[in-house]
Amino acid sequence: MNQVLTETRPIRLKGRSFLAMVLSPELPLDGWLELLDDLARRSSGFFLGRPVVLDMENLAIERAQLVYLLQALNDRGVWIMGVEGARPSLLGPGMPPAMRGGQPAADFEAPAGEPQANPGAPEPQISQAVRAPGHAVHAMPSMVITEPVRSGQSVYFPEGDVTIVGSVASGAEVVAGGSIHIYGTLRGRALAGTAGNTSARIFCRKLEAELVAIDGLYKTAEDLEPRFRGQAVQLWLDGDYMMIDTLS
């Protein structure tokens, strides 16, 4: 019997860029967690299966408070894949790893356009961590989906506009760096302008959305005026306010 000697194959290490949410907690933590609970209640499944990075850069807390926060998020089904901006003494065994070099794009922050129960309370801030372009892009690329987006499916295209020739089902999600055009019913979530594009818009033939967001400003189904539901509409930003109007 002949013995065949083979060379050990080297381990191949590759670099890839992935899309993740970034949560920026604020003090007091219990108050911020209540706001997070409200967001999760108004948009069911928003954090389900999402990798999330915790932004600690502007949060002055001690390790015990961080442990409490991580446990509270875990209890809510929010999976923290890493911590950014935390001083080394805060992190320890059993905690998510420290992350560096994140390039946040647009913040998902509730607009101040409509009165809230407590208008002085800060809203939880969420952002999309994406690869930022190195130079200004004048002609944004686009993606066209020629079939409906079904429940549980997600369409991510941070480079430009997304057009859906069909409907977006409840529990589905469309995320675009530019505008979103839906030639059907929007029942799920549509997040436009995630690359910091304040001129992005959302268009749909029939509005039944769970959540809409443009450049960080979001509205849930409860925030949308009833007279716009079931209508063909467009949404856009005017400063820090999200505007909505019917399509003629």
From Swiss-Prot:
Segment forming the signal sequence: none
Location of the region described as Disordered in the Swiss-Prot/TrEMBL record: 94-126
InterPro entries from the UniProt entry: CAP/MinC_C, MinC, MinC_C_sf, Septum_form_inhib_MinC_C
GO BP term (any one): division septum assembly
Keywords tagged on the record: Cell cycle, Cell division, Septation
SUPFAM superfamilies xref list: Cell-division inhibitor MinC, C-terminal domain
Family classification: Belongs to the MinC family.
Role: Cell division inhibitor that blocks the formation of polar Z ring septums. Rapidly oscillates between the poles of the cell to destabilize FtsZ filaments that have formed before they mature into polar Z rings. Prevents FtsZ polymerization.
PANTHER family: SEPTUM SITE-DETERMINING PROTEIN MINC
Protein name: Probable septum site-determining protein MinC
Species per Swiss-Prot/TrEMBL record: Brucella suis biovar 1 (strain 1330)
